[in-house]
Structures are given as C-alpha cells and as structure tokens.
Amino acid sequence: MSEEFKSLLSSDIIPENWYNVTPDLPEPLPPPRDTKSDFSSINLLNKILPKEVLKQEFTFKRYEKIPDEIIDKYIQIGRPTPLIRAKNLEKYLDYGGKIFFKFEGATATGSHKINTAIAQAYYAMNENANGVTTETGAGQWGSATALAASLYNLKSQIFMVRVSYEQKPLRKVVMSLYNSSVVPSPSNLTEFGRKILSENPDHPGTLGIGISEAVEYALDHNYRYMVASVMNAALTHQSVIGQESIKQMELLGEFPDVLFGCVGGGSNFGGFAFPFLPINDDIEIYATTAQEVPKFSQGEYKYDLMDTAGVLPAVRMYSLGADFVPPKIYAGGLRYHGAAPSLSLLINHGRIKSDEVTEEQVKNAIKTFANTQGFIIAPESGHAVATAIKYAREHKDEKKTLLINVSGHGLLDLSIFSD
C-alpha cells in the first residue's frame, strides 16, 4: 500500500468538529412554526429528541466538537471513507478533466446514514432512554439506527415504509441482526398507523407516515426519536463527509470545480456539499432528485409539515405537500415530499442547482459505474452519478475536476435489475 493511499485513509482525516452551515447561509434560516392552536409541535421536540441534538438543531455556532467516544465509533465503522479517482469512468466518457468520488458505501452499514445515527444514539444513551425509534425508506437509515442502538445497548423500533419493506427483504434481515424490531409502515403499532390502514389497507406507506408513527411510538414508550434527515442536526453530523473530502483532495493536490449529490431529505447532500461553501464561492453544486419526486421543479418553497400527521413543526422548504404519496419507485430513500430547510434556502437563492433524472438514466449510470469502476452503487447514489455523467458529456473539453458523493452501495438493491 502506497504512503499516499494510507494517508487518505488515516484516522487523522476524520474532523475534530462537525460543521454547521447556518452561520454561512445567505440569509437567516426561517424558524420552525407550530401549525395547531391547541398543540405545540416545537415543545414536542423537547420530549422526543435528545437534549444535545435539540441544542445542535438550533445553534448558530459554526463548529461543534465531536466527542472522542463518537470519533472512536466512527473509526470502528469504517471512517474515513475512501475518496477515489474514477479513471476508467473518465476514459469511458472521453472526459478531458478528472472525476473523483467519495464512497460512503464503505461504512459498516453501507451508507452515510451511520454518521448521524451514532451521534444521536450516543446522546440518547446519555439520557438513559429506554430505546430509540425512527422511520426508514430503503432501509439504509433503519440499518444505521439499528447498529448505532446496538453499539450503545439501546432497544430500537423501526417503521419501514411498506413498499420498501416488501421490495427489500434483506434490509429487514440486516436490522434484525442488529437486534432491532422492524415493522411495515403504516402499522398496527400506533394509533396513526391504524387510522391509515382503516382507510386503505393496501397503503404503500410514505416517509411522512413513518415519521408520524415513530414520533407517536417515542412518546408512548420513553424512546428518543432519531432524525434521519431534513433537520439541521442530522446535516451537521453528516458534515464529516465533506470535511474528509476536502482533506483528501488536498492530500492529492486537487480541488473540485463541481460537486454532485442526490437528495431525499438532504442529509447526505448537505453533509457532503456544505463544508465546501465557505471555501470557494465559485464551486458549482448539483443536487439531483428522482423525476418521480420533482420537489425542486414542481414543489413550492413554503412552510409545510415534515410528517403526514402534522406532529412535527412546519418548516420552510421545497415541498410537494405532506400528503404527497410518491410512486413505488426503485429508490426508496428519495421518496420524501420535502427537503432540508438549509438546502431549500440555498436552492431558492440559486447557489445550488437542481437536476432530475429518470429511472432509465439511473439504471444506465449504475451499470456504467459498475463496469468502469467496479462498484455497484445504491439507486439513490445513481441519481448523482447520472447527473455527473450528463455534465461530463456536455463539458468534456473544459477539463474541470468533478467530485461525486456516492452515498451508499447497492448490493441489497439488485432487485431493480431483476425485471
């Protein structure tokens, strides 16, 4: 192993602090709002979130010290993750510049999700919670929550969106191996789930419904709710991705001109792209969503509910509406109606550009990446790669350096190619 390669994977690459984008936004982040006169969703957060997570959600501090115990856990689960030059992809595309990718699929659970799951489970443990609960789409977040809970000897209850529960049975196996209880959502475990099922016994589920069920369960069982995405604390914890990428690129004597990431709620994208913002005002940034969930092109930038039941506060974001039921698409992690307020604000200001790609483009991108670089990537990550491939073909003679965040591997998502 070369010294350069060893340096790129040294534990010294892991940052000492999380980065919070709030102080560097072009305008103050609009605060969350209560939507009911007889019930405070904002006060509810005090009951379901670990106090330290809630503090990080509303802080204006640019940096937050990462506890040593969390850094130790980061090392245990595979951080820092590799940053690799995609030379074969460059050759295949006849691209005149360089293409790099950050591979979050190298973590223990195969995606970026574990970065914030470990932090939130650590804070829940410190509060002597009975356990943790959350929703999951494709199962990556559920797997990360299950592992993080296991590492801190906490119980975990996962509400998995029904369509993904049926499409991705091996994700259930992973969560069960980590001693988690997993049910399809909507479920009979909660009053809200039972209400949805009474109206439509075959409801495919949505992330918004899963959130509502998990919050209800947390209140009833003295569990802490684990925030998968959208909320600023989750994006802050994910900033290890971007900060590692910056250090690794510097070690290679490189710096990207263009960044690419996929967006469900925005956590992997924000964690990857946001740390670059204060460093370079000219860097181009592309956020890719599924064409079937066109939140940035057809959604409104407005105050809207984060969950279907309206238990959580409303936030200002790009949204297709909290009652939007996405098609049963191949990328369960992108079936969310909204996007993180910080990301939405930056897109509204034009600082970050958005793109939408089709299922065919995503499948072609996954196949191309597999046959050039060898990695079978997650369908969600395939969206970012599809946009990067499109960009490289349209700008092949500009010799720009491209950096893609590959948020996870796709080894448990192969059913999309079995049709």
UniProtKB/Swiss-Prot annotation:
User: Which Pfam families would you find in this protein's record?
Assistant: PALP
Q: Which PANTHER family match?
A: TRYPTOPHAN SYNTHASE, TRYPTOPHAN SYNTHASE-RELATED
* Protein name in UniProt: Tryptophan synthase beta chain
Its domain of life reads Archaea
Subunit structure, as described in the record: Tetramer of two alpha and two beta chains.
The UniProt function text for this chain reads:
The beta subunit is responsible for the synthesis of L-tryptophan from indole and L-serine.
Q: Read off the CDD domains from this record.
A: Trp-synth_B
Q: Which family does it belong to?
A: Belongs to the TrpB family.
UniProt pathway: Amino-acid biosynthesis; L-tryptophan biosynthesis; L-tryptophan from chorismate: step 5/5
One GO MF term: pyridoxal phosphate binding
Report the EC code(s) recorded for this entry. Answer: 4.2.1.20
**Which GO cellular component does the record give, naming just one?**
cytoplasm
| Stretches assigned to coiled coil | none
- Major enzyme class: lyase
Q: State its cofactor.
A: pyridoxal 5'-phosphate
What keyword terms does UniProt attach to this protein?
A: Amino-acid biosynthesis, Aromatic amino acid biosynthesis, Lyase, Pyridoxal phosphate, Tryptophan biosynthesis
Designated gene of the protein: trpB
